[in-house]
Structures are given as C-alpha cells and as structure tokens.
Amino acid sequence: MHGSLLKLALLSFSLASSAAVLPRDTGRTSAPSGCSTVGTSGDYSTIGDALTALGSSTADACIYIAAGTYEEQLVINYAGHLTLYGETTDTQTYKQNTVTITHTISSPEAGSLDNSATVNIKSDLVSVYNINIANGYGSGAQAVALVANADQLGFYACQFTGYQDTLYAKAGHQYYINSRIEGAVDYIFGDASAWFENCDIVSNGAGYITAMSRETTSDTAWYAIDHCNIKAASGVDLTGDVYLGRPWRVLARVIYQYSVLPDIINAKGWHSMADGATPLYYEFNNTGAGSDTSDREYLSTIDAPVAKETVLGDDYKNWVDSSY
C-alpha cells in the first residue's frame, strides 16, 4: 500500500514538473484575457489607436497585436503597467515573430535621436513580447529603432533592426532576453542600466556594438552582455572590423560575460571616442575566435561576473518575467 502511494506521488510530481516546462515553447495566436486587440479583425486597426484608447488610466493594461507589418511611429507614455504582445507560434524565440513595427526616418531629418525612433517608450513598467521594431533608414545617418527611456522595461524575444544607433537604451533599468539586435555603428547606446541575456547581437557593417554614456562615478548604470552570441549578418564579411564598444561619455561601463565573440571582433576589442574618457570595459569567460584579450586596449580586469542585482537592482524579480 505504501509502495503504491509512493509511486503515485512520484508520478504526480513528474507530471506536474512536465506541465511546468511545457508552456516555454507554446504559441500566442490569440489575445490573452483582458487585452485589447490590433489587426484587420481587431478592436483597432493601428497600434497607435490602441495606445490612444488607454487614455489616462493607471490600471494594468495589455494590447495583443495580430500578425502583420505596421508602418507606424509610436510614443508610449502610459501611467500603468502596460504589456504589448505580438502574435507568435513560439513565445520563447524571436525567430517565429510575425509582428513588425517599422518606420523610416533619420535623426537629422527628425530633428533629434528620440524623434527618429520607430518606438519611443517614456513610461515605466512596459513589457514587450515577440515584436520586431525596425528603422529602415539604413546607412548614412543615425536612425533609431527603439528609444527605451524609462524604468523597469522588459523585452522578451523581440527584434531591433537598424544601422547606426539602433537601440537607444537611454535611462532606467532594462532587461532584454532571447532577442536580436542588429546594426553597425553604436547600435546599443545610452545610459540605461541594461542586461542582455541569450541575445543574438548582429553586426551588418563595420563599426562598434556599444556606445555607453555613463559620465559620473555616482551613476550605477551598466551594460551587461551575458550569454549572448555576437555575429555578422548573413552574407557580410566583417573579419576584424567590429569593436565591442567605444565610450559615448567618459565613464562608459560595459561587460561581456559568458558570450561568444567570433573573428569579426577586432583584436584591440575596444575603441576611443569621448575626449578624456576612462571607460570601464570588462570581459569575463567569453569564448570564440574573437575572445582572446591579449591585445586588448582600454580593458579593465574583473575577477567575477556581474550579477543581475548589480545591473537591474535588488528588486528585479518583481518586474522581470521569470518564465524566460
């Protein structure tokens, strides 16, 4: 009798454990409960209209976006916790994303970096799932895909595409996981404290991946690139043509840890930009043909990886989605 009960308990535990991991590769092809919808048969035909309809409410809100390419330029400034969901057959990867928000304008044309952004997030507590954000301008000028200028922002299995200044991680605490970021020149830049985990960071031209703008010793911001894959865009030969970063401001602070650095990374690793800069650039336990640090410039030593708490704050588990 006791043996039968034990077997039943073990079976129940096994089933429960299996059920816990099954949702990790499930799709999202219909709106979660309570979400407004965007699409040809949705509540709204544009994402902008759905955002406008939120008004001045402070309640938690969510918007589900059906498959499609949306030619829009969006400013998100909502007083409550807002979640944007893109339609997908696999929530854990950007590779099955079906929703793209795109706009094409350069910073000189728009009048500022922020005004060139396809999506500009100004409000705290925004979570974005399975959405591609692109600025189609290409080379020749700065042209931002995303401005992330708020606190406690999370991006899950998203894509950000541009050429120069793709992702403006401007301020606040930010979390990027299972995502893809593409560009050539300074394509992750700003002064946010941002954690990038299990991301594909893709160079489509010669240049610099990061341009961090920390400039005071009291500024706690980091860029932490953790367990990421650095690579060249398909069909582009960039051997030795890509630097891990250069300082937009004098005390830039960036670490690459447990990441794959291929032969596109220049042996010097890092580059200069801001006059008088004394950046804090670190590398820890990386692999790949570009991970040899013997010829590095501007590299500081570090004895341990940087922790999420250091980058995102001790309370990060309260706002980061732990299912990723």
From Swiss-Prot:
A biological process (GO) annotation for this entry?
Answer: pectin catabolic process
Annotated site residue numbers, Transition state stabilizer = 164
Q: Where is the active site?
A: 165 (proton donor), 186 (nucleophile)
**Which pathway or pathways does this protein act in?**
Glycan metabolism; pectin degradation; 2-dehydro-3-deoxy-D-gluconate from pectin: step 1/5
Instruction: Quote the record's binding site residues for substrate.
Output: 142, 246, 248
Where are its TM segments located?
none
Q: Which residues form the signal peptide?
A: 1-19
Alphabetical GO CC annotations of the entry are:
extracellular region
Location in or out of the cell = Secreted
Report whether DNA-binding shows up as a keyword of the record: no
EC numbers on record: 3.1.1.11
Q: Which domain of life is it from?
A: Eukaryota
What PANTHER family does the annotation carry?
ACYL-COA THIOESTER HYDROLASE YBHC-RELATED, PECTINESTERASE 53-RELATED
Protein name, entry field: Probable pectinesterase A
Q: Which gene encodes it?
A: pmeA
